[in-house]
């Protein structure tokens, strides 16, 4: 008998067991496909390159009418509570049960809505050219791919059907680990990314932004080992919650860059899948005409598992004619690559045949009709849904599951055939970021009102009270202890990653995104992004912070306790006098207790006087100073010694790398925050206990990093060192948890100062009035 019994998957009835009206609804749900049948006279031809980018954008009235009528219906949703509306539409979604059933029944890896959508596309169109099967090799490129569900879906499709080909893939997305990226623009789920980083290309600047010409050039070099690219997918979009009626216009530049990248990299006869939304505007019409001229077949497809009430569609393009056929035009289009497309239109009106416009209008009307019907029906059911309608919806959802499984013939895949058979990373940003990205607790109108509030109004209305109150009772360090383990630091496999200097730190895999975002807003709105500590933020005599400051005596008491623990474990010989290196301090104050340690001072006044700013610990000057102090300290330490090291914050990969090195050469690391009453200065210290020696190759590697830092700073280079320890190493569970605790304590301390000061000023003004 098997020791491990699998949870049985619920047996499903045949679709034919449902009533004809239920079946008719489900057939229609799975039939949202429109094909561009080309005219026999072959009049859909690309214009002469001299005609592109010569005219202004001029919209077509017929398409604008469709856009306006759709937005009129969308506007009816503006006063709906987002959490209530999403709960409602989740229930009315006829395909709502498919994802969970697929996940359980076929053991699908990273089974998300995107996984199911792409599986529908794979099973509905001949995406993989016959050449790939004939040659036994398939190459695919996936743009804007996070979290990687298209790749996981394709892997399941190939492995479960046992297609006779070796598959290689390369993917791109906005780098979830790059500090200058905005987390609102990204999908912060890195379950696949963290374990397959070698196959992800983030461009020469490491941001992952495809909307630069340097990215396109770099990508071509990155995939140069692929003889031909058979399939390109592009699943990009922006968060358009702030302006849903203009989604098409907001993503037009991204779609342009995705299309140019695909046409530049795709091999002859290859396939291209592009996510689009409504296609009413001139820029979208031009791209659709371009694709119809460059590929033999173009289909617009809305998968059943794509929510019926949104504008999302997938443009499926088959049998690419090749770069040679469009080379002169493609070269000119490449010059227009970037975030800000030229104000001129790709094609003037007169080069687009009426036959194409007619066919495109039919396509837009086709999907417009389905979307309007869905939104209107959802509004009707939101206001009143009886038991009969609930029962019908449940039947529809059950039938959709049956139909999906029968139509696409999904097969079970063992975990041994997954892309990530066993995660090498104990904890990734996914588990930390879960639930943070979208907080649907306000209506669209309420969110617009909140955006309109000034920073001072938000403070006055108490929007940030929870941060200050939570910080007031927060006692970090007492439970945040990072235990070191003997590990082989394979620094010969590491490499130093350079990139463009960070303008500010917006994102960090080592901190709660909401806290960092709020702190940045506080710095920017309250302090203008910089501090003048001699004036505005020098505390007045009567100003005091309600949070407790940890004294030097308390810190040394904790240090001695941890040292005694090591002696009890016989890690340190009791007879040896332990040295305590105090970094960055010129003297000791107010210590009345007996310290059974040999205390030595390593002065570095600058290290403790750095102020919090929008750059945080991303300032290369601070990073060089911190590393320099660390290298000097390590030369002084012997086995069993301890060190107290002040730290500004650890939001960046660079600083996280240094904490990892400390983690590797000390038995325990903990922290105390706040340790200073100075506003917005360095307010945390690391207690590093039980030095275990740092291998010489690692020390030499750190020296080379330090030398590069100095060279870049002295030459006023536009580059800086972004990373020197692999992300796979930095995302291990215990280290990641420790960094989250440390950064939360530091950020909340700074927020407390700013918000409390703002409150004082507001109260003072109110008293004067």
Swiss-Prot record:
Active site (UniProt): 117, 235, 275
GO biological process, any: 7-methylguanosine mRNA capping
Catalytic activity as recorded in UniProt: a 5'-end (N(7)-methyl 5'-triphosphoguanosine)-(2'-O-methyl-ribonucleoside)-(ribonucleotide) in mRNA + S-adenosyl-L-methionine = a 5'-end (N(7)-methyl 5'-triphosphoguanosine)-(2'-O-methyl-ribonucleoside)-(2'-O-methyl-ribonucleotide) in mRNA + S-adenosyl-L-homocysteine + H(+)
Gene3D superfamilies (UniProt xref): 3.40.50.12760
Entry superkingdom: Eukaryota
Entry EC no(s): 2.1.1.296
InterPro entries listed in its UniProt record: Adrift-typ_MeTrfase (IPR025807), mRNA_Cap_2O-Ribose_MeTrfase (IPR050851), RNA_MeTrfase_FtsJ_dom (IPR002877), SAM-dependent_MTases_sf (IPR029063)
Ranges for domain Adrift-type SAM-dependent 2'-O-MTase: 109-322
Enzyme class, spelled out: transferase
Localization of this protein: Nucleus; Cytoplasm
A molecular function (GO) term: mRNA (nucleoside-2'-O-)-methyltransferase activity
Keywords: Cytoplasm, Methyltransferase, mRNA capping, mRNA processing, Nucleus, S-adenosyl-L-methionine, Transferase
Coiled-coil segments: none
Binding-site positions, S-adenosyl-L-methionine: 148, 167, 235
GO cellular component: cytoplasm; nucleus
Function in brief: S-adenosyl-L-methionine-dependent methyltransferase that mediates mRNA cap2 2'-O-ribose methylation to the 5'-cap structure of mRNAs. Methylates the ribose of the second nucleotide of a m(7)GpppG-capped mRNA and small nuclear RNA (snRNA) (cap0) to produce m(7)GpppRmpNm (cap2). Recognizes a guanosine cap on RNA independently of its N(7) methylation status. Display cap2 methylation on both cap0 and cap1. Displays a preference for cap1 RNAs.
Entry protein name: Cap-specific mRNA (nucleoside-2'-O-)-methyltransferase 2
Organism per entry: Pongo abelii
């Amino acid at each position: 008998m098997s020791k491990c019994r699998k949870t049985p998957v619920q047996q499903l009835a045949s679709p034919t067991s449902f009533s004809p009206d239920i079946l008719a609804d489900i057939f229609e749900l799975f039939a949202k496909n429109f094909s561009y049948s080309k005219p026999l006279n072959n009049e859909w031809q690309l214009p002469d390159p001299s005609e592109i980018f010569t005219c202004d954008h001029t919209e077509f009235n017929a398409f604008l009418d469709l856009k306006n009528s759709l937005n009129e219906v969308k506007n009816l949703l503006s006063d709906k509570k987002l959490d209530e509306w999403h709960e409602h539409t989740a229930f009315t979604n006829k395909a709502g049960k498919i994802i969970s059933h697929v996940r359980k029944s076929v053991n699908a890896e990273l089974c998300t809505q995107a996984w199911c959508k792409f599986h529908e596309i794979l099973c509905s169109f001949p995406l993989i050219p016959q050449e790939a099967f004939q040659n036994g090799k398939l190459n695919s490129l996936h743009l804007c791919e996070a979290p990687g569900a298209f790749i996981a879906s394709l892997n399941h499709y190939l492995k479960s059907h046992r297609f006779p080909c070796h598959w290689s893939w390369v993917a791109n997305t906005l780098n979830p680990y790059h500090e200058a990226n905005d987390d609102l623009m990204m999908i912060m789920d890195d379950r696949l990314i963290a374990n397959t980083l070698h196959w992800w290309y983030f461009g020469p600047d490491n941001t992952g932004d495809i909307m630069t010409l340097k990215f396109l050039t770099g990508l071509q070099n990155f995939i140069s080992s692929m003889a031909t690219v058979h399939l390109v997918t592009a699943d990009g979009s922006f968060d358009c919650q702030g302006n849903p009626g203009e989604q098409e216009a907001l993503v037009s530049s991204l779609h342009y860059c995705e299309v140019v990248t695909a046409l530049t990299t795709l091999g002859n006869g290859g396939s291209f899948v592009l996510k689009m939304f409504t296609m009413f505007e001139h820029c979208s019409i031009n791209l659709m005409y371009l694709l119809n001229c460059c590929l033999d077949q173009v289909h617009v497809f809305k998968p059943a598992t794509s929510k019926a009430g949104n504008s999302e569609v997938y443009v499926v393009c088959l049998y690419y004619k090749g770069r040679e056929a469009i080379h002169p035009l493609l070269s000119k289009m490449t010059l227009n690559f970037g975030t800000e497309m030229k104000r001129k239109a790709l094609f003037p009106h007169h080069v687009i045949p009426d036959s194409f416009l007619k066919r495109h209008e039919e396509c837009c009307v086709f999907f417009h009709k389905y979307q309007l019907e869905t939104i209107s029906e959802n509004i009707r059911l939101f206001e009143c849904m009886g038991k009969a309608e609930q029962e019908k919806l449940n039947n529809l959802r059950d039938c959709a599951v049956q139909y999906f499984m029968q139509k696409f013939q999904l097969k079970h895949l063992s975990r041994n055939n997954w892309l990530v058979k066993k995660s090498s990373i104990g904890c990734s940003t996914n588990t930390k970021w879960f639930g943070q990205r979208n907080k649907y607790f306000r209506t669209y109108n309420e969110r617009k009102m909140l955006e309109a509030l000034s920073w001072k109004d938000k403070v006055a209305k108490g929007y940030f009270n929870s941060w200050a109150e939570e910080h007031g009772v927060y006692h970090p360090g007492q439970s945040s202890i990072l235990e070191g383990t003997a590990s082989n630091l394979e620094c010969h496999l590491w490499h130093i990653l350079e990139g463009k200097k960070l303008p500010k730190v917006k994102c960090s895999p080592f901190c709660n995104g909401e806290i960092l975002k709020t702190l940045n807003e506080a710095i920017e709105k309250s302090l203008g992004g910089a501090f003048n500590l001699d004036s505005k933020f020098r505390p007045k005599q009567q100003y005091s912070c309600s949070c407790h400051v940890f004294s030097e005596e308390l810190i040394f008491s904790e240090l001695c306790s941890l040292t005694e623990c090591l002696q009890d474990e016989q890690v340190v010989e009791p007879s040896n006098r332990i040295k305590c290196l105090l970094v960055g301090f010129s003297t000791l104050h107010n210590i009345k207790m007996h310290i059974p340690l040999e205390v030595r001072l390593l002065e570095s006044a600058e290290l403790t006087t750095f102020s919090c700013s929008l750059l945080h610990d991303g300032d290369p000057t601070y990073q060089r100073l911190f590393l320099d102090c660390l290298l000097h300290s390590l030369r002084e330490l012997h086995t069993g010694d301890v060190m107290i090291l002040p730290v500004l914050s650890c939001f960046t990969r660079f600083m996280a790398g240094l904490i990892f090195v400390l983690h590797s050469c000390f038995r325990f690391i903990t922290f105390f925050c706040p340790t200073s009453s100075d506003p917005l200065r360095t307010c945390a210290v690391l207690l590093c206990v039980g030095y275990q020696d740092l291998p010489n190759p690692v020390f030499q590697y750190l020296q080379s990093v330090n030398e590069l830092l100095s060279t870049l700073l002295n030459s006023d280079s536009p580059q800086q060192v972004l990373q020197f320890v692999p992300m796979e190493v930095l995302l291990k569970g215990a280290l990641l948890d420790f960094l989250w605790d440390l950064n939360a304590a530091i950020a909340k301390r700074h927020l407390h100062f700013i918000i409390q000061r703002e409150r004082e000023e507001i109260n003072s003004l109110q008293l004067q009035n």
